[in-house]
Amino acid sequence: MKISSHNIKFGAIKLLSSLAPSKKYPDVEYVSIPQMDFLGYSRLIIEDLQKYFTTSHCLIVQSDSFVVNSSLWKEEFLQFDYIGAPWSNKIQINPNLVLHLEKNPVGNGGFSLRSRKLVETTAKINFNSLNFPMKAE
């Protein structure tokens, strides 16, 4: 988080985790959440993320991602509801199911900027009612 927030002014920096950080930083608010699996995390992002931020946008930075060059930030990014890392063109779910994502290659939310409007809209989705081969946020 310290790498991703270097030279960037955020409205707030929050660490949502089931584990308390070993080192505390005055500008990072630790928010305790239950330990969860892949589906639990997807449910959190789809149904509950809006509970954790009050700003116009939220930058999600998972433990395997970080901001590389903060000087590339543009205020125009805030005009979009979602900016995220690309998926592979094909994702093998199981031996009999391959998702072809050539027409919609964006959706990898591990490093993504999401608007409050988008997050409040997805919160209306009943995660358990989703009928997809892969329930990824």
Residue spans for each PLM region:
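Short, conserved loop/helix-junction motifs that constitute active-site signature segments
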Residues: 7-8, 52-54, 74-78
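Conserved donor-nucleotide/metal-binding helix-loop-beta segment in metal-dependent transferases, i.e.
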Residues: 65-100, 104
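Generic structural signal for small/hydrophobic residues in well-ordered secondary structure
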Residues: 13, 63-64, 115
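Active-site-proximal specificity loops/subdomain of glycosyltransferases
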Residues: 14-56
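Short, acidic, metal-binding catalytic loop of nucleotide-sugar glycosyltransferases
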Residues: 2-11, 25
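Short beta-strand-to-loop acidic/aromatic patch adjacent to the donor-nucleotide binding site
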Residues: 55-68
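Short, hydrophobic beta-strand segments that form beta-sheet elements in well-ordered domains
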Residues: 9-18, 83
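Catalytic core and acceptor-binding pocket of nucleotide-sugar-dependent glycosyltransferases
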Residues: 104-137
